[in-house]
Amino acid sequence: MICKYIKQNILYITNNLSILQNDKVFLIYWRILDYSKMIPKKQFSIEYVFQSSPQLLFQYLSTPSGLSEWFSDDVNSRGEKYTFFWGDSEEDARLLSKKPYEKVKFQWMNGEEDEEDCYFEFTIQMDEITKDVSLIVTDFSPEEELEESKLLWNSLISDLKQVLGST
């Protein structure tokens, strides 16, 4: 049953690649299909070094205007609900927690409320001695898609660094 559902979605995506405007849209769309809640996911974290202040970085991770600069084409928010737009598709996420200049955590709303593997989190750390700023991205991915998920985040964070002038 799951395999049939996956094959149907692969066929849909393959037939509609012209609508899915770029690789990022494809990978994000693929990762949040409903079938994904049926497949066990593995948590992973990636650390990126930034030449930016935690305050500025936080603005790009926590506000609709900041997120629309690098994460998606556009972002709307109403309270804790954020709607992310990529071309003709949109996905909703709930802001689970936000600690100024330190942490932002979102949960995709396509899954069950109690699903622990349906969130992504940004953690900002600053080394007290060197003052180096790091961003740690925590996400979940099916084991067989782990490398693609990491490549997606690498590409997204590269865009963020470019926006911040931190390349």
Feature locations, PLM:
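Asparagine-rich low-complexity intrinsically disordered tracts
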Residues: 8-10
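Hydrophobic ligand-binding cavity/cleft-lining segments
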Residues: 13, 19, 23-75
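Charge-dense, helix-prone N-terminal extensions
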Residues: 37-41, 48, 52, 68, ...
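Hydrophobic pocket/interface hotspot
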Residues: 57-58, 67, 82, 95, ...
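Hydrophobic-ligand binding "helix-grip"
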Residues: 73, 85-134, 138-142
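A conserved amphipathic terminal alpha-helix motif
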Residues: 140-167
